[in-house]
């Protein structure tokens, strides 16, 4: 690439990074609002005397952790020099599959497949945390 285009390329890269940062900041604020809403929902379900409310409480807790993990991912993005660590996506994947097992546990074969997916993600997490792939 000719050196004439270098300033233009740098400007475009910085402008796109600024747009991305602003969008992630907005997404983080929205997720914090939803986290607050989920907190109120969990408090309501906790004091509901229905027997079904225990399943809703556990499902709500897992959704709460999903919001929490996405917010932590956005925070880590800004702390780590504008990149997403892979292991946070793996944490989110494991939590999402656990939520799926809690909500939809009708088919034993499906639960077995979801459990195998969790095992694969845990192995991936182990590989990501090994010294060969660790960046942080």
From Swiss-Prot:
Residues that span the membrane, as ranges: 15-35, 58-78, 82-102, 108-128
Superkingdom assignment: Bacteria
Chief place of localization: membrane
Pfam families, A to Z: PsiE
Keywords assigned: Cell inner membrane, Cell membrane, Membrane, Transmembrane, Transmembrane helix
InterPro entries the UniProt entry points to: P_starv_induced_PsiE, P_starv_induced_PsiE-like
GO terms for biological process, alphabetical: cellular response to phosphate starvation
Name recorded for this polypeptide: Protein PsiE homolog
Organism: Klebsiella pneumoniae subsp. pneumoniae (strain ATCC 700721 / MGH 78578)
NCBIfam families: PRK02833.1-3, PRK02833.1-5
Gene name in the database record: psiE
Record's subcellular location: Cell inner membrane
Recorded topology in the membrane: Multi-pass membrane protein
Family stated for the protein in its record: Belongs to the PsiE family.
GO CC terms: plasma membrane
């Amino acid at each position: 690439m000719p050196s004439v285009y270098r300033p233009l390329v740098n400007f475009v890269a910085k402008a796109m990074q600024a747009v991305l940062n602003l969008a992630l900041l907005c997404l983080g604020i929205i997720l914090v609002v939803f986290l607050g809403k989920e907190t109120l929902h969990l408090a309501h379900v906790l004091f509901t005397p229905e027997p079904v409310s225990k399943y809703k409480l556990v499902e709500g807790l897992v959704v709460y952790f999903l919001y929490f993990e996405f917010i932590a991912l956005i925070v880590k993005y800004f702390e780590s020099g504008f990149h997403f660590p892979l292991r946070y996506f793996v944490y989110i994947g494991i939590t999402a599959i656990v939520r799926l097992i809690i909500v939809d546990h009708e088919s034993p074969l499906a639960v077995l497949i979801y459990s195998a997916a969790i095992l694969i993600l845990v192995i991936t997490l182990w590989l990501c945390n090994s010294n060969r792939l660790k960046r942080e």
